[in-house]
Amino acid sequence: ILDLGCGSGRDSKFFIGRGFDVTPVDGSEEMCIRAEKYIGHKVRRLMFEDLDYDGVFDGVWACASLLHVKKEEMNETLRKVSKSLRPDGVLYLSFRYGDDERRSSGMIYSDYTEDTLDTIINNDAHLRMIEWWISEDTRRDHPDDLWINVICCRL
């Protein structure tokens, strides 16, 4: 599993604890250091635009990470993510639900709806959307936020 934008390493630790071979990556040096300490595993510093894997993963986990990609760059980013998967590999994505793109504290935040994601995913990314659902935010300070969760398969 490629944990793309692993952040603190929370999900990588979960997957490793269940016996999966995990490759955690993050674009932030600070988050890489934090994740390495938390999971006891090397974390590669890698920006989304520099993704360079070719058909090596059965799954890519991008939980609330690709929301930091500008909307104008999402098609190309998803092509690179798709390329990292083996044929029939599975991709999980999540984004805050909506249509906004904003900058806060130097970071980009891109929100998506199911229609927008369906268009992007079916736009030459060699992916097929299998399922999507909306979930509530579990953080207490964001009670009104909704998230869109998507599962795709590489063609």
Model-derived features: where do they sit?
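Conserved class I S-adenosyl-L-methionine
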Residues: 1-5
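Conserved S-adenosyl-L-methionine
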Residues: 127-137
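Class I SAM-dependent methyltransferase SAM/SAH-binding core
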Residues: 8-50
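A short glycine-rich, Lys/Arg-flanked "PGG" loop and its adjoining helix->strand segment in the class I
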Residues: 75-87
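A short acidic, Gly/Pro-enriched loop at the edge of an enzyme's catalytic core
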Residues: 49-60
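Acceptor-substrate binding/catalytic loop of class I
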Residues: 93, 101-116, 139-140
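Conserved beta-strand signature within the Rossmann-like core of class I S-adenosyl-L-methionine
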Residues: 88-95
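A short SAM/SAH-binding and catalytic strip from SAM-dependent methyltransferases
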Residues: 59-73
